[in-house]
Amino acid sequence: MTALWRDPAKKETGYPAKWTYDHGLVLKGIERVWEKSRDKRYFDFIQRNMDHFVADDGSIRTYTIDEYNIDHILPGRALLFLYKTTRQEKYKKAAALLREQLETHPRTSQGGFWHKKIYPSQMWLDGLYMGEPFYAEYAATFNEPAAFDDIAKQFVLMERNSRDDKTGLLYHGWDESRQQRWANPQTGRSPNFWGRAMGWFAMALVDTIDHFPKQHPKRAKLIAILDRLAHAVTKYQDPQSGLWYQVMDKGTAKGNYLESSAACMFVYALAKGVRNGYLPSRYKAVAKKGYNGILKEFIKRDSNGQLNLEGTVNVGGLGGNPYRDGSYEYYLSEKVVTNDPKGVGALLLAATEMEIASKRR
């Protein structure tokens, strides 16, 4: 595991000095491996990673609340895991600090969280995974029933403002102000359907529904959003490889390529959705086909015998400096790398779900 993610106990050069979302995704994947294996090394790895950042008073090294970056909420899921497992107060205090951010985080006029303070009036698909599973788990753990209406609202707004009626796919971002160059002046939507952005949204749904009270009136809305998403994702699955393209609706257009992190995210969301009864059983075959494609196309053994995950786009965003215009050409311009944490974390989640599925025949 340390070949793919730095171990803080070893003080290795290159260990992330900042509290980051990809860090949180990898740890969530390792948590699922620990739950399956109960190998203490995985638990210790998660705890060492969090202790690298969290002080005894619950403060988080390098985290500043007034950046209002929704990405910074995601690693808090490891804090909730550690608190529930160890009952150490420092993890509860640190999680409460992240929960406090959500109280004052800037919002659109409709009540949707901005992606970041530096991206005003914008909601991105990515942000739903960054914030809502933590928000829902925190609310369930510490008895905040009123929070669930707000959590459901984030998904309803994101789908309403980004879903394309023709394809069923969701545009990467939405700008309420229509001020960004990437935003459609009529709708505020960005121009393309990015695979990993939809993967983040899919994972956000299944992980959030897990914590929703079964009798909550908005739970059925979230399941309906997931079902619509699963239908669209299935429609754009490549029939030969079982994978999905970087720009989902462009298929074999010049420069487009099959991308690994989105595939891992879709496989996880579909398989888990079926297992937990959120999705019809027919999606199990879609997940299996996708997983077989991942194993065939993206898992490669190097000369040292180590398995690697290839084919992950390094990053994707909108606006900023240098400016990302959301064009087809932009999404194809980002580097494709090996063992990117966003791919590795999603692969661990997908693999554990598919292992569970294989034993439930």
Task: Give the location of each predicted region.
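Short linear capping/connector segments at secondary-structure termini
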Residues: 113-119, 174-177, 244-252
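CBM-like carbohydrate-recognition segments
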Residues: 1-24, 36-43, 52-72, 76, ...
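Oxyanion-binding "anion nests"
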Residues: 202-251, 255
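His/Met- and acidic-residue-enriched segments that coordinate or traffic transition-metal cofactors
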Residues: 1-18, 26-28, 57-62, 128-130, ...
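Acidic/serine-rich, low-complexity amphipathic helices located in mid- to C-terminal regulatory regions
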Residues: 126-141
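Long, well-ordered core segments of solenoidal/helical folds
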Residues: 1-10, 44-61, 93-112, 145-181, ...
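Inter-helical turn/loop segments and adjacent helix faces that build the functional surface
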Residues: 37, 138-149, 208-220, 273-282
